[in-house]
Each structure stands twice: as structure tokens, then as C-alpha cells.
Amino acid sequence: MASSCLFNASVSSLNPKQDPIRRHRSTSLLRHRPVVISCTADGNNIKAPIETAVKPPHRTEDNIRDEARRNRSNAVNPFSAKYVPFNAAPGSTESYSLDEIVYRSRSGGLLDVEHDMEALKRFDGAYWRDLFDSRVGKSTWPYGSGVWSKKEWVLPEIDDDDIVSAFEGNSNLFWAERFGKQFLGMNDLWVKHCGISHTGSFKDLGMTVLVSQVNRLRKMKRPVVGVGCASTGDTSAALSAYCASAGIPSIVFLPANKISMAQLVQPIANGAFVLSIDTDFDGCMKLIREITAELPIYLANSLNSLRLEGQKTAAIEILQQFDWQVPDWVIVPGGNLGNIYAFYKGFKMCQELGLVDRIPRMVCAQAANANPLYLHYKSGWKDFKPMTASTTFASAIQIGDPVSIDRAVYALKKCNGIVEEATEEELMDAMAQADSTGMFICPHTGVALTALFKLRNQGVIAPTDRTVVVSTAHGLKFTQSKIDYHSNAIPDMACRFSNPPVDVKADFGAVMDVLKSYLGSNTLTS
């Protein structure tokens, strides 16, 4: 049996408490870590260990890569993955090695990364839970990464030496206690801060996978001279950083005057070749696809399904942070729409492999100025119509013709999902409200929070539902929008929750008068 590969005392999990913090705390802190012994594909023990609880002492001349090489197992890897057409018809035999440079199926459709689920199923859910838990908080290469700690489910065949990682992932799952209670009447609201990452957005999760595979392809002498992407900001930041780390040239197509300066400076600082093009994201996307068809530049946009393999680990991580309890709702901002499918894929793999018994309902939240999925949903999933996106403060999702529309629709149908939208005023107000309770979120998270407000008001999400809002980028990338909001400088917007600074003379009496007015006349009485 596969479970014979896991040596671990049988300890029952503590019963969940009503207090969200107690429910959230991992019981793994109260038990011994497992010792994982390497197994053949049929579950029989073999001599060489994959991981052991006790490792040889660290040699001072080793870095973590050297140490990983020295401790490398000679065990046969039973896991594999390949490209297949997305949502292929039953009986389809079309497939491609991950070492091939291919982005579309023969019919022109999207590709997906398909894992050998039968090989993965030879090990039960308890095995995978304990293996993933045993890697948390470690510096062992490459498992200290929140992505590569799930390597067997991501790129199982890549050599550790080819991996390009900043130990991304492992991002904070924040209990939004005050915000939930004050504004929504909720006691179990969480924000998954994927923007607390190497380059400040969730795109790092996918880019570590894609650039690692490119690193492998280049070592195999495949024709890849660089990696290119079209971007609304965050993709280019992640691509340029990971390529710089590996010494791989990066080429970035950006829509002129449509991203924040904080986003623009990241690829420039990391040495990318940046083209500022007089078009929108959809125009940049069209150009990069045409260019990569003619030049040996590897395409890094989410048309490439490798990125979704890294992004799906955020879903697995949420379950792990809840000690493998499933939340009721997960709300994800959507632009190019790969991320909503990635989250679905992560949750679904956990269900299929026995780590959990169900998946959450998901919500995709769009800006009203760039809402083709929302309109498609409201039409009853009738014929999808691309649109020309208007300017939105949520610039990273200002996309009118999303590449992953089919993936998003598939995921939402499978999880009984919902699509909501947010106007500019709604998303900025939601961002300000969240910030006033101790967060510092991006406008895209404001879109997701607006969706939550609407679904709470409609009674769709109950006050006791455990709900996770996915925050996709760091608020520090979008400070100008916050400055404009709190300065009441946005035309035709009331900025109801603005908090502008108060000008006051450098005089003791003047300062005292202002403070008494703010705090109440009796507060400062001696």
C-alpha cells in the first residue's frame, strides 16, 4: 500500500473550534513531523531516501544548491506530466512533452499540463498532506519555496539544478477581523496576500515555473534566445526578475502610459529590454504572439500553461494554512483569467488525490470597465464577445479579450461559481475601507472586495461562511491611486473614505486645538 511509505504516529486532528484563529492554527505543530521514505511506483520501499527527518550536517563550504546535490536521492522518479489540449474530447491522444516549445493544440486551442494522476494516486492524501507540511519553513533547496514544496504536482521531472526560485509563495493568510466585522458582519474573512512576494504580485508563482523550464530548455540547447511577454505590469516585473536571476534575456511589451511607474521601473531595473507600445494590452498580446512565432523568443504569457502550474499552488497553500479544511468561498480578481482556472485546478487536484473531500465555490471579480467575463456570465454563458477595455485603476486586469476565457468558464461551471463586477468608485472605496482597518491593498483586491460586498448584500455569502479574498499584488505598486483618492483629486468620485492630512501652523495652541477637535475636548484634559 502507498501509505506504508509514511512512518508517522497516528494522531487524530483536534476538532475545529468556532474561533477562526483556533480553526486556522495547524495541529501539525503538536505532532512529530513525518519521516518520508522513497517508494517505487507500486508503493514498495527502496533504499534511497527522497527526504529524511534527519539530514547530514551542513558543510560550511556548501550553499543550499550544493547541499541539495550532495543529498540527492538516486530513487526513480515515478511522476510525470505532459501538455494536452485543454478540455480535450474523450479519446484524444494528442500530447506533447514539456520539453517541446508549443503553445497551442493542433486545432489552435489552449493547452493544459496534465499530470500522471494514477502515479500520484498510488500515495494517499495523508502522505501528500504530511509531505507538503514537512517542507514548510525550511531552507532546503528547492522545497523552501511555496511552489516547489509541491514539486511533484508542478514540474515533477525537472532537475533541481535547473530551478530558478526566490523561495516565492508561503504568503500570508490574513484574518481580516476588523474589516469583516465592521463592514460585512463577518467573523471568518481572510485575505490571501499573494502580493507579498518577490516582485510584489502573484505572478511570481507562475514565473518561477516557466523560467525554470526555459532554463532547462536552454541547457538542452533548444532554440531559446530569450523570454518575452506582453504585460499590464506585474507579469513583466516577475519575468524580468526571474530571467535576471538565471542570466536569461527578457523582452517586455508594455502598453504606453497604461501602467503605474512602480510597475514600469521593475523590468527596467532588472535589465529587461522594454518596448513601450502605443496600444493597449490586447494589442501588445497580439504583437508578442506574432513575434514569438517568428523569432526564438519563448512566450511567457498565460497562453503558456506552465505558469498556471505555479499559480495553482496558492490554492493548495490556502488549504494547507487552514490545516486542510476547505473554505466556503474563494474570490479572485480576473483579467486575462488564467488565475481563476489555476485556483480551480489546485483545489481539484487536492480533492482528486484525497487531501480534501470537496472544493470551495469560487467568484471571479472584474472591473466594470473591463468586464467581458461578467457580461458573458450574465448572458447565461451565451456567445462570448471581446470588448475594448476602458481605463481602470485596476490596471493589471484592464483586458477586454482574455486569453484564458475558456479556462475561466470551465472552472466556474465546475465549481458552481459566480462572476461579479466593480465600478471605479466601488473598487476605490473598498480599497480605502480595507486600508483603514490595517491592510494596504491594491485596486484589484478592491475589485474582489467589492464583489464580496455585493454577494453579502444579496445574501449569497452568509456571515458565517469562511471566505478567502485573493489579493493579487502589493499596494505599494499603486500608491498614486491612493494619493489621488485621499487627496479627493479623482474627478467625479466622492472619495467617501478619504483621509487627507490636516494643515496646521507650527504653533502649540493650534496643534492642541486640532487634536482636541479630533479626539474630543475631554480626551486631553489633564
Swiss-Prot record:
Query: Which positions are annotated as binding pyridoxal 5'-phosphate?
Result: G335, N336, L337, G338, N339, T472
- Which SUPFAM superfamilies does UniProt cross-reference here? Tryptophan synthase beta subunit-like PLP-dependent enzymes
A GO cellular component term found in this entry reads: chloroplast
Which sites bind S-adenosyl-L-methionine 1?
Answer: P142, Y143, G144, S165, A166, F167
User: What are the binding positions for S-adenosyl-L-methionine 4 in this chain?
Assistant: K181
A Pfam family annotated for this UniProt entry: PALP
Entry EC number(s): 4.2.3.1
List residues binding S-adenosyl-L-methionine 2.
N172, L173
Q: Which GO terms describe its biological process?
A: threonine biosynthetic process
Q: In the record, what terms sit under GO molecular function? A: pyridoxal phosphate binding; threonine synthase activity
Q: Where in the cell is it found?
A: Plastid, Chloroplast
UniProt activity-regulation remark? Allosterically activated by S-adenosyl-L-methionine (SAM). Activated by S-adenosyl-L-ethionine, 5'-amino-5'-deoxyadenosine, sinefungin and 5'-deoxy-5-methylthioadenosine. Inhibited by AMP.
N6-(pyridoxal phosphate)lysine occurs at K203
- Organelle targeting sequence: 1-40
Physiological role: Catalyzes the gamma-elimination of phosphate from L-phosphohomoserine and the beta-addition of water to produce L-threonine.
* Membership in a protein family: Belongs to the threonine synthase family.
User: What is the protein's quaternary organization?
Assistant: Homodimer.
Protein's UniProt name: Threonine synthase 1, chloroplastic
This protein's species is Arabidopsis thaliana
The gene coding this protein: TS1
